[in-house]
Amino acid sequence: MCKWAQNPEEVEFVHTVLERLAQRYGHREGLWGIELINEPALQGAWELLNIQKRYPPVDEEMAKGSAPITVEFIRKFYLDAYDRIEKYLSEDKYIVIHDGFELTIWKDFMREEKYKNVVLDTHQYLMMAEMMGCEQTVEGYEKYVKEHFMKEIEEMQQYFPVICGEWCLFNSLACGWDTKGGQTVLNGLEGASVETYTPEQKKEIYQAVAKMQKEAWDKGSGYFYWSYKLLTDTVNTDGWVGWDSWDLGRCVDFGWFPLDK
């Protein structure tokens, strides 16, 4: 159900939550920053992911009227939220805005002098690149990463400090089948229960996509891996071959993720 932005009371509630977080933690040494909202689905992401089909509502009646968030709404939300929490934050804290999966549309946003310590967060996944037509080969991934991830981050770094706040090594090639953009048994797909590649072959694939993606993130101001630990047992649960690549701990243990820096 995606109707939050249509309800002023719910929008105001989120603003008050952000205010309370800023008041409570705004001067804590351990706080780096506050992200105003996670992954607002703008029109492009809504259509690409086919949200209503990918995540079918439990209550269809309640979900009627669900729609993507508009650029106009999210821009106003960010401006209002900034004004409401900035005064509670010490000067070394950051306010983070998510790009809504439209990284390059923010060039004219928050250009005024008053907006300080604003970071632009982008979430980039190879599974979404596959949905955009990226060839499911190491060479295809590298081409897409260079032409899109790297190019766009370098371009937007001129306007904001850019972080890749979510990414991982997951890709359909290593899974051995087209995951249709990272869909699983939870979406009604069978998944894979038998490995397609040897451990050494998988290691080569993952090391390659790790290297190319880290080179792209280096064009910005930093990155955060999606998850340190994945609770799903991908070994003993049917249909989950390849999903251990969402788990940074496993990626390091298996030698897939380089620890050079």
Please describe what each predicted stretch is.
Residues 28, 89, 217-220:
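Alpha-helix termination/capping residues and helix-transition junctions
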Residues 16, 23, 30, 41-211:
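Extracellular glycoside hydrolase catalytic/binding regions
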Residues 1-36, 82-84:
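An active-site-proximal structural segment forming one wall of the substrate-binding cleft
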Residues 37-40, 101, 226-232:
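Short, solvent-exposed turn/loop segments enriched in Gly/Ser/Thr/Pro and often Arg
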Residues 4, 32, 46, 106, ...:
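A residue-identity detector for tryptophan
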Residues 186-261:
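Aromatic-rich peripheral "rim/lid" segments of glycoside hydrolase catalytic domains that contact
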Residues 9, 51, 172, 251-253, ...:
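Intrinsically disordered, low-complexity regulatory segments enriched
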